[in-house]
Design a protein with these regions (language model features):
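N-terminal signal peptide c-region/cleavage motif recognized by signal peptidases
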Residues: 20-22
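Bacterial N-terminal signal peptides that target proteins for export
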Residues: 1-11
Length: 285
């Protein structure tokens, strides 16, 4: 029933987007990465607030409502075709509603009805391989490493280092900006340091402008475990449907979106709001 409802919402989102005007290459509140870099010598700063209902942590067994604030992103345009990215957050708080049996539950130092930690830092590089042309999409590669900043003891971290590589493509067709990602993630097993799990990553987003300043956006983004049988906790398949909008004035942009989990371990629903500021900061030789 839940999958059926989400399919209806996704179809309605695509239909609504198909009635608007095109949008350029932008990011928040979307997760699917556009292959276009921000430009040589430019810096992109973004921040936001996420509220997630029924967030699960299979490795620690904790479950509850999650607040992430602030979520932060910082990108540097190191050339006309390359971008260096840092994404993370300063404070994650989980209001615990359930404690389920889990392999790493014995490591928890949480005694009350809440726990908090920082967000794992993701360091990434995006390199555009081909600019968009009349008859072909723009293309890029993105390499990312997720560092183990959040801890097992808080129940919010896995203490693993993960690596991702993805192929990015985008095309503006008439009034539609369509972006697709496909890639591979190598996730450390939090229960056994000698093992890992490979996941297939995917993302598909659409964006349309309703006015010169406002857009509506939507996407499906997630990962699929490739391991035969039950994957290690924390490396399972995940997916999210995002529906939202953006409003841009000059170098500033405000955004907001509702998101819905596509798997049993994803949050049932949630909301994200944030801002983006882009400016020219330095010259690239």
């Amino acid at each position: 029933m839940r999958t059926h409802r989400l399919a209806i919402v996704a179809a309605a989102t695509v239909a609504a987007l198909a009635l608007s005007q095109p949008a350029g290459a932008q990011q928040r509140p979307l997760v699917t990465e556009d292959p276009e870099p921000i430009g040589a010598g430019r810096i992109l700063l973004e921040g936001g607030l996420d509220l997630a209902h029924n967030q699960e942590y299979p490795a620690s067994g904790l479950e509850g409502n999650l607040v992430r604030f602030p979520t932060l992103g910082l990108s540097f345009g190191i050339s006309s075709i390359a971008e260096l990215q840092f994404d993370g957050g300063l404070f994650n708080h989980l209001s615990i509603s359930n404690r389920n049996p889990a392999p790493l539950a014995y490591l928890l130092t949480v005694t009350g009805d809440g726990t908090h930690d920082i967000e794992d830092l993701v360091v990434a590089t995006k390199v555009r391989l081909k600019a968009e042309a009349a008859g072909s999409p723009s293309m890029a590669l993105r390499f990312a490493t997720r560092l183990p900043n959040a801890t097992n003891e808080s129940g919010l971290g896995l203490d693993t280092t993960d690596f991702f590589v993805a192929f990015l493509a985008a095309k503006t067709v008439q009034s539609v900006r369509l972006v697709g990602n496909i890639g591979l993630g190598i996730l450390g097993d939090p229960t056994d340091g000698q093992r890992q799990n490979e996941v297939f990553t995917y993302g598909l987003s659409l964006a349309r402008a309703t006015t010169d300043h406002a857009e509506i956006v939507g996407e499906i983004n997630g990962r699929v475990s490739t391991r035969a049988g039950e994957p290690s906790p924390g490396t399972e398949s995940r997916g999210t449907l995002n529906i939202g909008g953006r409003y841009t004035r000059g170098s500033y942009r405000l955004d907001g979106a509702f998101f819905f989990g596509l798997t049993p371990v994803d949050p049932t629903a949630g909301i994200t709001v944030g801002f983006t500021y882009v400016f020219t900061a330095f010259e690239v030789p």
